[in-house]
Regions:
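N-terminal donor/sugar-recognition subdomains of glycan-related enzymes
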Residues: 1
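Active-site neighborhood of divalent metal-dependent phosphoester bond hydrolases
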Residues: 52-55, 61-126, 130-133, 141, ...
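Conserved, charged catalytic cores of large soluble enzymes
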Residues: 144
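Core catalytic region of metal-dependent phosphoesterases/phosphodiesterases
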Residues: 4, 10, 14, 19-93
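Histidine-centered catalytic micro-motifs
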Residues: 17, 136-140
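Beta-strand-turn-beta hairpins that frame and shape the catalytic cleft
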Residues: 5-12, 126-134
Length: 165
């Protein structure tokens, strides 16, 4: 995904919210987030905290929030698809998120949420007044073998797919 900003809009990047809806709302209030701003959530919306549904709906309220998939988001989507769609999509680590969500959302809504996650990019190319940035929720786990193969980028940990260059 490519985003270009050619004005004086505020651009914020935050990651690792991990289900903390109240903290996220306080952050938006603190930065006085408004319709002219852009917020990029750089992965890991889900897992660990206890308010995933509230956080999800809070994010959906804004047209000017962009989301990048993080490893926890990928795991949540995979678990939902396996549990409610009855098909295996890859490995995942199960935290508390799906158990909390299924108390409040229908199976159809759970699958829609998984689809929403999977539609999000792994990175965003951001240009602000001519300066270029690439934002990704990534950590490299480089072994000597991985370092030798310059055609591959390893994002996240071993649960992520390899992005071939």
């Amino acid at each position: 995904m490519d985003i270009t900003i050619d004005d004086n809009r505020n651009v914020y990047v935050v990651s690792d919210i991990h289900n903390y809806a109240d903290g996220f709302k306080r952050l938006l209030k603190k930065i006085q987030f408004n319709e002219n701003d852009l917020l990029i959530i750089d992965g890991d919306i889900f897992d660990r905290g206890d308010t995933p549904v509230e956080l999800y709906f809070e994010i959906l309220r804004y047209h000017n929030i962009q989301v990048i998939q993080g490893n926890h988001d990928v795991w949540v989507a995979r678990q939902i698809i396996e549990q409610f769609g009855h098909r295996k999509t890859g490995e995942y680590i199960s935290y508390n998120t799906v158990a909390i969500m299924e108390k409040r959302l229908t199976p159809v809504d759970m699958l829609r949420l998984a689809e929403w996650i999977q539609e999000k990019p792994y990175y965003i190319n951001l240009t602000i007044n001519g300066r270029k940035y690439q934002i990704a929720h990534a950590q490299t786990f480089l072994t000597p073998e991985r370092m030798l193969d310059k055609r591959k980028i390893y994002m996240g940990d071993w649960h992520y797919e390899i992005i071939k260059c």
